[in-house]
Amino acid sequence: MKNVAQHDVEKQIAELREQIEKHNYAYYVLDQPSISDAEYDELMRKLMELEEQYPQYKTPDSPSQRVGGAPLEAFRKVTHRVPMLSLSNAFNEGDLRDFDRRVRQEVGDVRYVCELKIDGLAVSLRYEDGYFVQGATRGDGTTGEDITENLKTIRSLPLRLRQQVTIEVRGEAYMPRKSFEKLNEKRKMNGEELFANPRNAAAGSLRQLDPKVAASRQLDIFAYHVVNAEELGILSHSAALNYLDELGFKTNPARQVCETIDDVLSYIEQWHERRASLPYDIDGIVIKVDAFAQQKQLGATAKSPRWAIAYKFPAEEVVTQLVDIELSVGRTGVVTPTAILQPVRVAGTIVQRASLHNEDYIREKDIRLGDYVVIKKAGDIIPEVVCSLPERRTGKEEPFDMPTHCPACASELVRLDDEVALRCVNPQCPAQIREGLIHFVSRQAMNIDGLGEKVIAQLFEHRLVRSVADLYTLTKDELVALERMGEKSATNLLQAIEASKQNSLERLLFGLGIRHVGAKAAKTLAEHFETMERLQQATKEELMAIHEIGEKMADSIVTYFSKEEVKQLLERLRAYGVNMTYKGAKQTIDISSTFAGKTFVLTGTLQSMSRSEAKEKIETLGGKVTGSVSKKTDVVVVGEDAGSKLEKAKQLGITIWDEARFLQEIQQSKQV
């Protein structure tokens, strides 16, 4: 029997939870904050303090569970009770009218529900007796991954519903633009690779094994479908969305019921114009038959329902003025021109810079200083200049000529054989050294946390670092003298630098920035030669005998290790205790694997993994991945929104695998 004091504590905890969830709903779902951030933080602090003191009163639906628990070892596989199908796409008015005609021929009069197509990650959410018990990714549509702990960190997702109902809901997890911009700014400061777009950032966040990482990313979610709606007595999609509102889910308020296809087209036109004003990315409109009875009558193919279609917006193009062209020197010496623009909003973000690729591109497009230009942003971090608008010229515009000398060190620029880029070949070029340092400490290379671009710029400016080896001579006093570098940060950074000495050889190889040697080739070389010394002594012929090492890469490796300054650098790194041996397991390829010796091409978007993950799996199983389809291609792996590569594969009679077949072959090859 509980004593009075315990009863009071339990009551206090329950009241705190109720208050916090009420404020959560007001802030994250209704977008109407009811208290200040400081007041909210104080309520949360009190709750967590009480739950820490009285763990017997901690429950799975407590708001405290949203901060993220202990890291997971791996994601458990989840089989969807009802497959998560993808949608067929429409790209123009004709496609939509064809869809409407097919639907009406089958079911007669119909009304549609139009919804914004949120550019995020589809997830399945299962509740039992009103409590959130499991969340999973779409995966291949049949099997996904259990990401329950990461989904719990999304503040707008209810952990307990307003009714004790058992329900399965589908939703779209996404990253708002402000959260995306903050995240990329932080990653840039830390010298980490930037996310290309909010969708990739959301997907990457939900696939973190540490829920605290997901909690820090400020994700959001819209619920859009009730899987077992008819069991609950719901007869239409619009009614199901209203029911989700009643339960406490966040649904998209922009949805609209349309009686005709013309109403649908008006809705699409309206949101095509307004999409930039939204605080999140959308890439189209989803159109669904409203009545469940008609949905059932229309049925589905193996891949997609016949009662729904997704209209995809074309990539957004806008016009602005090019005010200048800025030149930057990369770590390999390539001089890249970037357009400096009058600020303009594209796809919801303010753009001031756009890629101009190279000198040939500027000349072919006749792009001049002062021109009005068309820019396009289709998922890339930096948009590109599509073309200039000569008809808007006033006569004041000036043709742009690439310089003959490096903007960073004044050395003469050269254009190597078969290259369009101009290159600075001075190994002492400060811009190349600085960019090389940023590459060396990056996540895929030596992974030195805390050494972002701004810190490296300061180290460079204070002449503390002129080579990657200098990083291993830094002292605490030198670091503390830097701007915004306290004692604790300096200590952490020195520990990270020290820890990097134990990295396996492939990380060091990639970090050195040998021309043509990417992360995968570095792993191959490290695995084959096992020590830096053996690799340094390798001949061109020995290198070319290795699968995936071609003549160009072999020449580059031999040239690199023959340089006196490289030999001196490696000697310094050895002296400082940097590991130069391969620590991984020797890879053996089973020649009976379906992948062994075959050439693959990837096209479209895979739901279960990224393009780079798919490439790595193929290569691990003995296959090779190329970027274009030819007669030498053995298999084309097709994801959603596959393009011209799929058509070419069909024309050439090349074997085509969908994602389900691809995953099946991977599994079978692992079991061989």
From Swiss-Prot:
GO molecular function, one term: DNA binding
Disulfide bonds: none
Domain BRCT: 590-672
Sorted UniProt keywords: DNA damage, DNA repair, DNA replication, Ligase, Magnesium, Manganese, Metal-binding, NAD, Zinc
Catalytic activity: NAD(+) + (deoxyribonucleotide)n-3'-hydroxyl + 5'-phospho-(deoxyribonucleotide)m = (deoxyribonucleotide)n+m + AMP + beta-nicotinamide D-nucleotide
Statement: the UniProt record of this protein carries the keyword Transcription: no
SMART domains: BRCT (SM00292), HhH1 (SM00278), LIGANc (SM00532)
InterPro entries (UniProt xref): BRCT_dom, BRCT_dom_sf, DisA/LigA_HHH, DNA_ligase, DNA_ligase_AS, DNA_ligase_CS, DNAligase_adenylation, DNAligase_N
Positions annotated to bind NAD(+): D37, A38, E39, Y40, D41, S86, L87, E115, R138, E172, K288, K312
A Pfam family that the UniProt record links to this protein: DNA_ligase_aden
Active site, UniProt feature: K117 (n6-amp-lysine intermediate)
Signal peptide: none
Cofactor section: Mg(2+); Mn(2+)
Residues annotated to bind Zn(2+): C406, C409, C424, C429
GO biological process, one term: DNA repair
PANTHER family on file: CHROMOSOME TRANSMISSION FIDELITY FACTOR 18, REPLICATION FACTOR C SUBUNIT 1
Family: Belongs to the NAD-dependent DNA ligase family. LigA subfamily.
Purpose: DNA ligase that catalyzes the formation of phosphodiester linkages between 5'-phosphoryl and 3'-hydroxyl groups in double-stranded DNA using NAD as a coenzyme and as the energy source for the reaction. It is essential for DNA replication and repair of damaged DNA.
Protein name stated in the entry: DNA ligase
